[in-house]
């Protein structure tokens, strides 16, 4: 069945609480930042990045084994990861840092790059997170900066693969998130 996260909404604030039920060790692999996690079937994938060195890791058993590297030579600065069907979509920059080259990179589960889509015009100040909008079409929700100097103001854009502009956008001000990097 469908999992529902417990939460409360008081009219202005949505609070969601969740308890982890599974885990896997994610090895160093020369990269220090886990930039995103996605589940494809029963396999968990994650991207771990340091500078322009990004590794795609996979585990099939969250409790008994550690994740192993599927691909170590992804030349992107990973910012996030989501999945649609059997494909992974990595939010990334072609340089270390945020903004200037924000791209969605389509990967197969072996880490082969199948396509790229520049969303730099949609989020020129850099992006922080990505999630699939509906799980079947190549439609995403991108969390990005409205203004890098105000980390409490975030913009969310619904983006179709290869579209010239966002289908819709909304901004959350005084979110209290600070530098949030996860969007699910």
Put a short name on every predicted segment.
Residues 8-12, 60-64, 108-112, 160-165:
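Short loop/turn segments that connect beta-strands within beta-propeller blades
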Residues 151-160, 177-184:
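Blade-level signature of beta-propeller repeat domains, shared across WD40, Kelch, NHL, RCC1
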Residues 28-39, 74-84, 121-133, 177-184:
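Repeated scaffold domains used in trafficking and secretory/extracellular systems
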Residues 1, 50-53, 94-99, 145-151:
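Short glycine/acidic-enriched loop and turn motifs that connect beta-strands
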Residues 17-28, 66-72, 113-120, 167-179:
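A short beta-strand motif characteristic of beta-propeller blades
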Residues 43-46, 88-90, 139-143:
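Conserved beta-propeller blade signature
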Residues 2-5, 55-58, 101-105, 152-157:
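A short loop-to-beta-strand structural motif that recurs across blades of beta-propeller domains
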């Amino acid at each position: 069945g469908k999992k529902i996260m417990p939460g409360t909404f008081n009219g202005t604030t949505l609070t969601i609480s969740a308890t982890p039920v599974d885990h896997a060790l994610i090895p160093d692999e020369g990269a220090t930042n886990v930039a995103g996690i996605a589940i494809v079937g029963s396999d968990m994938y994650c991207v771990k990045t340091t500078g322009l060195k990004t590794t795609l890791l996979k585990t099939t058993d969250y409790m008994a084994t550690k994740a192993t590297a599927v691909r170590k030579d992804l030349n992107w600065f990973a910012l996030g990861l989501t999945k649609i069907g059997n494909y992974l979509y990595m939010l990334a920059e072609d340089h270390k840092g945020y903004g200037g080259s924000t791209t969605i990179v389509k990967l197969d589960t072996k880490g082969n790059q199948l396509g790229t889509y520049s969303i730099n015009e949609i989020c020129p100040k850099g992006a922080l997170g990505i999630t699939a909008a509906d799980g079947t079409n190549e439609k995403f929700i991108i969390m990005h900066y409205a203004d890098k100097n105000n980390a409490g103001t975030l913009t969310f854009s619904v983006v179709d693969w290869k579209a010239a502009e966002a289908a819709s956008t909304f901004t959350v001000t005084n979110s209290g998130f600070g530098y949030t990097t996860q969007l699910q």
